[in-house]
Each structure stands twice: as C-alpha cells, then as structure tokens.
Amino acid sequence: STRKESSAASDVYKRQVFNIEQYISREFGRRIGTKEEEAFFIGDGKGKPTGIFNATGGAETGVTSTGTSITFDDVMDLYYSLRAPYRNKAVWLLNDSTVKAIRKLKDGNGNYIWQPSVREGEPDKILNRPYRTSIYVPELAAGNRVMAFGDYSYYWIADRQGRSFKRLNELYATTGQVGFLASERVDGKLILSEAVKTLDIKAAGK
C-alpha cells in the first residue's frame, strides 16, 4: 500500500489563485505512481508487490553472464531463452546504464544490434523487439539482474483499494493549515515466471 500526507497553510488555500487541491492531487498521483513502478520492478513481496527483478517470485533467470560486463552473446542468449510464444509480445526492460552498453555492441559482422527507429512514434529496438527503461531496473553491475525480456501481460496487478484523496480540515486546524491524505492499496506478481527471463551479471570473484 502507498500512503502520502501533506499540508498547506489555510490562508493560502483560501486565497488561492490556482486550484491548489487539484495540483496536490496530481502530485500525489505522480508520487504514488513512482512508488508503484519501483515496487513492480524490485519489490520483495513483504507488504508490497513482488517485483519482476526480485530473485524470489520474480522472473526466471534466462542467462548468467560469463564476465562482469554484457556481450552480444548474452543478449542473443537471453532472447532465445524465452520460449517462442512469449517472444511475439516480448519487450526488453533495462536501465539507462545497460542501454548505453548495448548501444555499443556489434554482431559478428560488425553491425550494431541496436536498431534506431526510422518512423516517428515507433520505439528503437533491440533484435527487432521494443524496449523500455526505468531507473528502478538494477544498474549494470556485477551480481545484478540487469535486463528482462518477456511478455508482461503475465504480471498481474490487483487494486485492493482504489486511489483515494481526502482533505483533512480538522487535523491541522490548530496550526492554521489544511491537510491532505492520499492512499492506494495494490499488489502485483508475475503469475507465470517462464513468461519473462532475466540477464544476470556474474558476481565479482565468481
């Protein structure tokens, strides 16, 4: 569950020249969405969703690198570690640090495996499949699960309680403020672990 609380001076609230309640509601929504993104990727399942990259209950390991960096073979092996039926809708998930490394990789013919979009509105691709980035995907470093490839329709999200936004008039009355409380209860878990595979970087010293 996610819970956020804030307050504003009551005189500012009364003399507002713009809709401060609407602004706070949007800001709460943005922050709650950010926390949900984090949990859906790396949550440990203890009072929060089980993230795709969590070692327990998350995606299956498709490939473990032979070194502490990423290679063309690692990316190709990850692609084919995912069964063909799931590859039809598969998307890559990675951090910007991994994107940077992959953009430098070439195949055996010296061609970059990164495929820049040639049409407006279409994403760049890796091995002909689109990718998405998030700051919550683990960075490219030894011992991390740094990249996922799969069909994320098998990651189920349950809204246990719809998002609520309340104005608390009494709670901060003695301080001349107006309070706001936003909350939402959600859960998430990959129900079919074989639908998403990860690339794990070899731990240092192993």
Regions found by a protein language model. Give the residues of each.
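Structured, hydrophobic secondary-structure cores that serve as assembly/anchoring elements
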Residues: S10-K206
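Single conserved hydrophobic/aromatic residue that forms the stacking wall/gate
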Residues: S1-A9, Y13
